[in-house]
């Protein structure tokens, strides 16, 4: 459904009055070259709109202008959501976790750092 909305919003991009686009799990079932192409396209789309994208795909996260980590936990019977902006090493750690499932691998850190350097549109 998110990809259908991406297609519709892309066609209407220059004619609609929506300033914010939100995509939840747009990366479901994709990876590799398609994930990289989606990341490049989302960057292009973000030049004209504010784009918020919930993703679990490292290649899509590496393309972001800004990277946030959202977590939920239960405290005293209530669900509490926290949002943290990730910068520099924290961002590398999270992209490494998305790549390998564990951020402790030096190989995943190296790959994550390379992806961010290659695909991120600029310094945070």
Feature map (PLM): residue ranges:
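GG-anchored amphipathic helix commonly corresponding to the ABC/SMC/Rad50 NBD signature/C-loop
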Residues: 1-21, 45
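Short, glycine-/Ser/Thr-/acidic-enriched flexible segments
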Residues: 11, 28, 75
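Conserved D-loop-proximal element of ABC-family nucleotide-binding domains
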Residues: 15-16, 28-36
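Walker B catalytic acidic pair
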Residues: 24-25
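C-terminal lobe/lid and adjacent interdomain/linker elements of RecA-like ASCE P-loop ATPase modules
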Residues: 33-124
């Amino acid at each position: 459904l998110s990809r259908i909305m991406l297609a519709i919003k892309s066609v209407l991009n220059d004619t609609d009055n929506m300033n914010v686009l939100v995509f939840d799990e747009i990366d479901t079932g994709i990876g590799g070259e398609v994930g990289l192409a989606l990341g490049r396209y989302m960057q292009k789309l973000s030049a004209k709109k504010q784009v918020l994208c919930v993703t679990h795909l490292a290649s899509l996260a590496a393309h972001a202008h800004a990277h946030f980590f959202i977590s939920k936990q239960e405290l005293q019977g209530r669900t509490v959501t926290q949002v943290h902006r990730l910068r520099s090493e924290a961002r590398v750690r999270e992209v490494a976790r998305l790549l390998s499932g564990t951020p402790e691998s030096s190989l995943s850190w190296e790959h994550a750092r390379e992806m961010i350097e290659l695909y991120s549109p600029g310094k945070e």
